[in-house]
Amino acid sequence: MIKYTVLPEQKKVIAIVTDCEDDVIKTIAKNMPENLYFNEGAYKLKHSYKGIAKCHPDDEFDEDLGKKIARNRALIKYKFAYLRKIDLFSMGLLKWILDTGEKGDTCAQYIESLALELKDKTKTE
């Protein structure tokens, strides 16, 4: 939701994107398997993001233009934070996959070495 505050005497418009702290968590939960657990607190956004449009003193104040500019500035901040959290989650997931794969390879190598050891023991007996 975007809320606007118009201050014509200051030739200023403020736009605030609100109620967005759980947006990343909702995206992750919607797109991942139900049995995937993650630390939700690490992916929370701020409660709001603010954009401000200030009119030059020599220019004529235009409320609609000010709203568009302030809205875009607020959304840029919000989207940048959102994408940073998605990237953080993606990197964590990728690291987990790679770590799991490495552990799996290590486990497979260990089993293979035990099998070779057992094979060598049976040859000598």
Regions found by a protein language model. Give the residues of each.
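Catalytic phosphate/metal-binding cores of nucleic-acid and nucleotide-processing enzymes, i.e., regions
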Residues: 1-124
